[in-house]
Amino acid sequence: PVAGIQNGVFTVPIVGSAVWIEFEQGDPDYPIWTGCFYGSAAEVPAAALIVPPGVPGITLQTPLQNSLTISDVPGPTGGILMKTTTGAMVSVSDTGIVISNGKGAIINMVGPSTDINASALTVI
């Protein structure tokens, strides 16, 4: 959808993905990949399901579940959520910023306060 010199969106569907193909001027020697679709609801990225139906959102997710979700859900569940396969995450929302390494270390920034590892250190 976007391409330019040293910028753009680059994705390649994995083998077995459902894709739409068109042919330039109907010539089968010139296929054009024009899009993808989900064959069933089970194929929708899990990260996309955190955005309620009817709320604008964008989800990027790899087959191993690394994801980036941007949504207009108000409050702590909206905003931007970046997660890795191992559970590390960064959440930026109207209520604050949370950074977690997925192994117990958490930095929580809400208002003027910063809390590290469940109040092991709090800076106000």
Where are these regions (language model features)?
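Hydrophobic packing positions characteristic
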Residues: 1-110, 124
